[in-house]
A protein has these predicted regions:
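Sec/Tat signal peptide C-region and signal peptidase I cleavage site
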Residues: 17-23
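Pocket-lining segment of extracytoplasmic ligand-binding domains
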Residues: 85, 166-169, 173-258
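Bacterial N-terminal signal peptides that target proteins for export
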Residues: 1-8
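Conserved C-terminal helix/tail region of periplasmic/extracytoplasmic solute-binding proteins
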Residues: 296-326
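Bacterial N-terminal signal peptides
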Residues: 8-16
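Secondary-structure end/capping motifs
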Residues: 226-304
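Short, solvent-exposed loop/beta-turn-alpha elements that line the ligand-binding surface or hinge
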Residues: 47, 51, 201-212, 278-287
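Short, glycine-/small- and polar/acidic-enriched structural segments
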Residues: 24-161, 173, 177-183, 188, ...
């Protein structure tokens, strides 16, 4: 698999975003699709950052890797769900960024068309497999599963990049043989007639010999902003924790927010909201840190990242301090 590369600072100009943030303001970026959309919409609509005394500026990106590019360029201060793979790579490369939270769990299934002759994961050898673009945690985890659990070489399968709706369309059109799709996407496509042949959770458990699911997205924070606003990182994390708890407690409210902000139908919004507890997390406990370190080693084994992950790449202090905020 192609290595997750260091991201160019020139992205700041290309993205056309504003300059350095003022004290107690925070520029927050997230992908306007996939499972990032749901949490971002609830975070905004509930004004959770404002309730912690912060002034947020939300920046939505059309590409899964764009928030990390913006972070590397200094264009945003916090990404609510940066790709775990890219985040591990850039922090190992020494960029002045810190992982302060695990925020998304890789709750994906490997699926094929209902009438496909493919029955098992081993049958994917020589096939076209749809996944998120190179550089995403989804792509890195897919490669790790195929190459470690099934002894595939990179030449034994063809990865086809795309976002979930596009990959689902490719499957229906028989342009690809299989795809790794988020469970929330599958829930929103009841008429697509897809059949599950494997899951990220089970395959990761086989790979790592541990029960913890793979982490798909992380809260990534800019070190300079953290230094300039020493009490603000804990407030950001507190807001994230409260938004997560809100979603756990009030699924109908989440569905209403998704209908309004994402133009989902009532049925689709309800199906999305029902998956809240299984696709999101807001934590950086010792077990999460251990899981991310293990993930780095798995990615390194398949060439997705290089080097050594420094202990400073994972900063649990904002999470710990957030627990003191009522």
């Amino acid at each position: 698999m192609k290595r997750i590369g260091v991201l160019a600072a020139a992205a700041l100009c290309a993205l056309g975003l504003s300059g350095p943030a003022q004290a107690q303001s925070v520029r927050i970026g997230y992908w306007s699709s996939g499972i990032s959309l749901g949490f971002g919409a609830v975070l905004e609509a509930g004004k959770f950052m404002e309730k912690e005394g912060l002034t947020p500026e939300y920046v939505k990106f059309p590409d899964v890797n764009a928030p990390t590019k913006a972070m590397a360029a200094g264009a945003i201060d916090f990404a609510i769900a940066a790709s775990a793979g890219t985040s591990l790579s850039v922090t190992a490369d020494g960029l002045p960024l810190s992982i302060v939270l695990a925020t998304q769990v890789a709750d994906l299934d490997f699926v094929v068309p209902e009438d496909s002759p493919i029955k098992t994961m081993a049958d994917l050898k020589g096939k076209k497999i749809g996944t998120s673009p190179s550089g995403s945690a989804t792509a890195a985890i897919t490669s790790a599963i195929l190459e470690t659990n099934y002894k595939f070489t990179p030449g034994d399968y063809q990865g086809v990049p795309g976002n979930d709706p596009r990959l689902a369309q490719f499957l229906v059109q028989k342009d690809i043989d299989a795809a790794a799709l988020r469970t929330v996407t599958i829930a929103l496509l009841p008429d697509a007639k897809l059949r599950r042949i494997g899951s990220f959770r089970q395959e990761w458990k086989t790979l790592t010999k541990q029960d913890a699911p793979p982490i798909l997205g992380v809260g990534l924070m800019r070190n300079a902003w953290m230094a300039q606003n020493p009490d603000a990182p804990a407030k950001v994390v507190a807001a994230m924790r409260k938004a997560y708890a809100f979603g756990q407690a009030d699924k109908p409210a989440v569905a209403r927010i998704l209908q309004a902000s994402a133009n989902l139908s009532a049925a689709d919004a309800t199906a999305y909201a029902a998956l809240w507890d299984s696709i999101y997390t807001v934590s950086l406990e010792p077990a999460d840190i251990a899981s991310l370190k293990r993930e780095f080693e798995v990615f390194k084994a398949v060439g997705a990242v290089q080097g050594t992950l420094p202990d400073t790449a994972l900063d649990p202090r904002p999470y710990a301090r957030s627990k003191t905020i009522p």
